[in-house]
Amino acid sequence: MESHVVHNAQKPHVVCVPYPAQGHINPMLKVAKLLYAKGFHVTFVNTLYNHNRLLRSRGPNALDGFPSFRFESIPDGLPETDGDRTQHTPTVCMSIEKNCLAPFKEILRRINDKDDVPPVSCIVSDGVMSFTLDAAEELGVPEVIFWTNSACGFMTILHFYLFIEKGLSPFKDESYMSKEHLDTVIDWIPSMKNLRLKDIPSYIRTTNPDNIMLNFLIREVERSKRASAIILNTFDELEHDVIQSMQSILPPVYSIGPLHLLVKEEINEASEIGQMGLNLWREEMECLDWLDTKTPNSVLFVNFGCITVMSAKQLEEFAWGLAASRKEFLWVIRPNLVVGEAMVVLPQEFLAETIDRRMLASWCPQEKVLSHPAIGGFLTHCGWNSTLESLAGGVPMICWPCFSEQPTNCKFCCDEWGVGIEIGKDVKREEVETVVRELMDGEKGKKLREKAEEWRRLAEEATRYKHGSSVMNLETLIHKVFLENLR
């Protein structure tokens, strides 16, 4: 059902600015689609590098948009020869911080000079694209900051400055990376219990006081306090206490997720806006046909997201562990998944042995996969989009966190939400085999699946009904923040 809450003659005009990585572009596009469905004119701003990459992956007309949904691009300041720059987060963040404000202000000026487009009335920006706040303040329009992390992950980042004040980061030397030190209890972050240093986002685990990401994130969360509001892709029932604790230290915080479920309720998938996608890789839809031939809960889905990389040895251990489990699996293997390799090569013996019980893909429609009845478990890096989509699909997880706030998400999946089993960072095929069997067939797996089903039901209630928490939060956000200037 498409609904519109805006009826005034002058449409509100929102400019959406995602961070240029797949895991940030997708949720921002969902926010843009929801606002479009509510009657907003939308301008979606990619970096020029990703704009061109999207044209290559989705076709020359992919970004034509339509009258009330337009695409623009700004340069990211990096040399054209920089290869796949989405893999170099610190470099991208620093370049954006230094180079993007002027071209962004020029886009806003150009939009506001047009007679056939309503003037910009609000901006939604990714949490790490806060240069846009300067432009919003200069223009006199509200800005909403969208942090694409979990609430628990964002809450830990909000307290990075205290790790420095308490002498917990940066580490004095490499010996502080030991298991013993990483088991240090962290009991002073509001609403977050039983945390250890190892559960905190990886950026604090540095010996360099000038670490780019640690200092960049401290600056960005501080700048977020200038926003009119903050939105999170989560739902109140899942992270209620943490969200409540944030309200006292930040502008109003609105949880409006899971966004993919909200979009499903608000937008007809067959419509023009429903069909619009911004995947940097081509999705292999054959995955769904293969899953259609499988029995319920019989297939393990394996995907480590769009940025995570591993060694060739880790890849091999995962492969042989999956083979030994004798379970059917769908494994997404990006060409750049292995560090230093342009293409992933799996052992021929592995390919031959598993040919009748696996499908390999370079990218897939993950939301659809995780809601498919054949999927019985998910081996994941615990990126937030993946974690939330798994919860929304009622799918339990094997957690292999790598960086950023993935360790925090893993901790909550395993200990707070009751839907995950953690697997060791030093991947061993025997452990992979054991954990896969336990998740798919064991008693623990059964309990995790029951708990995941509870979260699936609560996620649906938050997004499907008029009084669902995320439905109401989105309506409040629109009327109290986005439309406030137009009254």
Curated annotation (Swiss-Prot):
Its EC number is 2.4.1.-. It comes from the Eukaryota. UDP-alpha-D-glucose binds at residues 364-366, 381-389, 403-406. GO terms for cellular component: cytosol. InterPro entries: UDP_glucos_trans, UDP_glycos_trans_CS. The keyword Transferase applies. Expressed in roots, shoots, leaves and flowers. It is an enzyme of class 2 (transferase). It holds the Pfam family UDPGT. GO terms for molecular function: glucuronosyltransferase activity; UDP-glucosyltransferase activity. Keywords: Glycosyltransferase, Transferase. Belongs to the UDP-glycosyltransferase family. This is UDP-glycosyltransferase 85A7. It comes from Arabidopsis thaliana.
